[in-house]
């Protein structure tokens, strides 16, 4: 209905309209939702060149923000990460959802996806013999993103049998955070490759909105501090105690339970103690 200041946009290179809760919520917040189908190009140089031409068309012809939010679902993660590694100065943040980060995991040489594996080789102009030096795995192209401190939010199921978390996003998370770069993870317990996204997209939407240019200047209040100490404790020490103060938040169902579940999803390796300290 009305574009937000700065004309922010989110760009999907694959699977437009699938599990679109984040896109729909951002549309209501004044974002442009943009699709350019590069699904079957596996983040190849050809895909990235086409994507760059498309990017300039969006910026110059339609006046969209010079910093785009990239959205990569499944194999769309190959394009999102690779294009961002080529152009970190053009990226506001990245939202990936069960993304492919290692082609040896998916489509994989021996995973039953022979047709997709061959299609990927053909697209990249590679042979089996040359795949040991494959240059397009996101797990190996993180340094340009980390140097630019591009914020990444990742949503995954911990029981994904198609694009296993342990072989893909877990590796990215470990390497990216080791470089000191910002990476938020929402890990869905017991969830396979589908369904993507979240029933309540608010955590992802809020992440994307607050990483747009000019966001802080547009706030009508000033925070007296932040949660960096808690974040470091949850991430590094992997223990945390959270106390809920007040009768309603302690006794009633609702916000307390939602916050507990949200923290456990965002910090799946952290052991939490929750205290209901009603006064």
PLM region descriptions:
Residues 162, 166-216:
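C-terminal catalytic histidine-bearing segment of alpha/beta-hydrolase fold enzymes
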Residues 113-170, 174-177:
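The feature captures the conserved acid-bearing segment of alpha/beta-hydrolase catalytic domains
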Residues 42-63, 82:
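Alpha/beta-hydrolase active-site loop
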Residues 214-245, 249-272:
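N-terminal secretory targeting modules
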Residues 82-130:
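Hydrolase active-site cap/lid region
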Residues 72-82:
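Glycine-rich nucleophile elbow surrounding the catalytic serine of serine-hydrolase chemistry
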């Amino acid at each position: 209905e009305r574009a937000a200041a700065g004309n922010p946009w989110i760009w999907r290179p694959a699977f437009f309209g699938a599990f679109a809760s984040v896109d729909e919520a951002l549309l209501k917040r004044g974002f442009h939702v943009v699709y350019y189908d590069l699904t079957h190009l596996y983040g190849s140089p050809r895909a990235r060149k086409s994507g760059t031409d498309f990017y300039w068309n969006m910026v110059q012809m339609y006046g969209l923000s010079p910093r785009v939010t990239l959205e990569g679902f499944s194999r769309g993660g190959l394009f999102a990460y690779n294009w961002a590694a080529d152009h970190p100065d053009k990226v506001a943040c990245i939202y990936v959802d069960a993304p492919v980060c290692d082609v040896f995991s998916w489509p994989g040489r021996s995973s039953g996806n022979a047709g997709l594996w061959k299609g990927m080789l053909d697209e990249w102009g590679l042979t089996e013999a040359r795949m040991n030096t494959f240059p397009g795995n996101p797990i190996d192209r993180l340094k340009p993103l980390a140097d630019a401190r591009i914020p990444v939010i990742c949503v995954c199921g911990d029981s994904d049998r198609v694009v296993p978390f342990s072989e893909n996003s877990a590796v990215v998370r470990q390497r990216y955070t080791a470089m000191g770069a910002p990476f938020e993870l929402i890990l869905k317990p017991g969830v396979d490759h589908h369904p993507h996204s979240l029933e309540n997209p608010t955590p992802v939407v809020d992440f994307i909105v607050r990483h747009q240019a000019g966001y802080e200047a547009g706030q009508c209040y000033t925070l007296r501090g932040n949660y960096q100490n808690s974040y470091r404790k949850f991430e590094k020490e992997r223990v945390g105690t959270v106390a809920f103060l007040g009768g309603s938040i302690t006794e009633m169902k609702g916000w307390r339970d939602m916050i507990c579940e949200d923290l456990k999803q965002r910090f799946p390796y952290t052991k939490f103690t929750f205290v209901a300290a009603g006064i």
